[in-house]
Amino acid sequence: MNTNSELSLENLNAAGDAAARAIPPLWPLASSVAVNPYLGQTAETLALAGARLGRVGGVPVTMPRAWYAARIADGTITDADLSAALAVNPTAAADLEALKAHAEQPESAQKPLPTLADLAADASGIDWPGILADRIGLWAAGYFDQGQALWAAPHRRGAYDAWRQYATHDLTPEIAGLSGFAQFVSETPDTADQASTRAANRLGLSDAALETYLHQLLFTLGGWAQVARYRLWQAELAGKSDATITDMLTIRLLWEEALFAQYEEEIGAEWEKVVAAHAAPVASDADLQVNAVLQEAWERAGQRDLAETFSMPAPKADDTRPALQAAFCIDVRSEVFRRALESLTPDIKTLGFAGFFGLTPAHKGFASDVDELRLPVLLNPGLTSTSQGDDAEADQTARFKARASRAWGRFKLAAVSSFAFVEATGPIYAGKLVRDALNMAPNDVPGGPMPRLDPSVDLAAQTDAAETILRAMSFTDNFARLVVLAGHGANVVNNPFASGLHCGACGGYSGEVNARLLAGLLNNVDVRRGLVERGITIPDDTIFVGALHDTTTDAMTLYEADHPSKAHAADLKQAKAWFLSAGSVTRAERALRLPRAEGTDDINLRSRDWAETRPEWALAGCKAFVAAPRQRTAGRSLEGRAFLHDYDWQQDKGFGVLELIMTAPVVVASWISLQYYGSTVSPDVFGSGNKLLHNVTGGIGVVEGNGGTLRTGLPWQSVHEGEDFAHEPLRLSVCIEAPREAMSDILKRHDGVRALFDNRWLHLFALDENGQMAWRYEGDLEWSQMPVASEAIPETEVAA
């Protein structure tokens, strides 16, 4: 079949590149971070993205209608919310009553266009989509393996060449009924470009049909396409390119060609209709527009509640020198701990800043040669650091132990020796099994020698970095005697997603290395002298101490040994007591949300429980991002649902810090928020399924069962507590106290960030001089004034 003119390689490559960029990247498990599953659709509205994803995968982008109807019925969503949302898209319904009527009616299910594999399955009764997913998955698990496999696949070839070598010896497709598949593969052109051009022309694809059809083929590969997209992402960060994802597209296209060659007579006519449907422009239908309006209305309801929170009484500004200042990551889990800590005494002040603390190191841990990229995945490393100490003997001993452990592990898993291992050494593990089963194993706390820059940088560069970071934190005066810089990390067992519970701003690692590095920088006497010349004076009696906040148990570890100071012994003792008390208060609050947690002791036990699928809720529930002075949120409960970034625009000359916040932390927070959103509204596609069925493959990700499609996104247990959702899928509300003109100027310069707000993947609000949500960004650089939630209550004195 070829009813169209020949496709040009240029057009095919352009469409293939667009399809590749419609796929989000997937980071490996060792350093996994949240990724926006709609990353390739942010230039479109929610309804239009729903039409596109519906065509290629049948993906819902909102909750079922009944979800919204229930919230309309119980008053959560008011008529005012519905009317305001309808004003954004007035063509969705004739009026308010019509919109309510739509909410009561179930929408039509999104059905994807069939692939050739689907059509061949219908014609033959053979599950070709399942077979090709299994065969491609089996090959991809070996090809992308990151050290889990005992017999690793060679990486000398590109993905296309490696697959051809594999597929010519794979008889499973022929056994299943695809005659001559191995021969077909052996006769494919030597280059992926030639192979994809031949296949596309043989299938009769038009230029117009390529866009969504090629996207669909990559979409059917699930996480394997996302692993390939990750390779392209990393290559482009380094100023290079990578063809893995286009090779994967060629592989999937060749499967279509092979199936078409066998079943053309049975499916040819139906296939022509599919090609024509792919060629039609993507457009949202009435159902999708109604759904988008209902989602908007629900978010308006949440924003009403947020505005009420901002209108609550705030503690009076206190310029006296605090006894303790503690800087935490902006992560929503920090909000609960910060609130608990500040409630103990007015002498404690907390700050919020991105958890990488402005440093972008490629770090080598103690006795390790692995580069850990402890920085946001949007950036390249700007520094190198190490925890290698001066004790060469200790380093070598640790390396010997690590090698012995790896060798022992391979002996346990090898094809032959594994049987002898179980027979000979099984009883030795009885004690360990009992200890682990009873949750008696101690929590692991990252330690090691104090990290340092290696190589170091000159004093001017160190001073520049210190000034930039302190100004970005709006932290340039009134320093306490003790300033704790707290990174964060999780402490769990038997959890492939452990790195996803760590600090996203640190690339999926815990944040203590960055915190300790910054503490060392700010304790440097020469750096402090340089800062004085730049208008920042840190008192001689101020000491900075790195720390780690364990978000699973809310324990705090201080690394005071990095900078021993007898003069601060009493300060440290008092701080540790405060942290213990705050941890207890925080655990009590978290226990109210966690299933089967009856008290603070249960929280500690959960972190060591092999069978616990919900050791913590991580960022479930996130709904807001606030960049403002701490005074605007202090003393108010944001329920662990808000990212809190300290920012004082009056100290920000030229609005460079504001630009950094809007283009980095806000974007990272959007990735987190939209990953939770996608894993909730479409768990079958954008979620990784049931933890109880997971098998780790290749150190990359997980599959459900014994192979097939790599699952991505969050497990079901991360967004659902068994009876109801733990996460409410709300697009993030970003609240910034800064002039609207400054924010608009930044949006003008950054098209990608502007698209997030213009297309309502994020909502933007300007806080006024009283910290109230006063202005809403409507898109296209336009703002509208908001009704005052209630009269702002005056500041109040804080009781000592």
From Swiss-Prot:
| Main location (coarse class) | membrane
Q: Does the keyword Membrane apply?
A: yes
Q: What is this protein called?
A: Probable inorganic carbon transporter subunit DabA
Give the membrane topology, semicolon-separated if more than one. Answer: Peripheral membrane protein
Q: Name one GO molecular function term.
A: zinc ion binding
Q: From which organism does this entry originate? A: Roseobacter denitrificans (strain ATCC 33942 / OCh 114)
Which positions bind Zn(2+)?
329, 331, 488, 503
Would the keyword Cell cycle turn up in this protein's UniProt record?
no
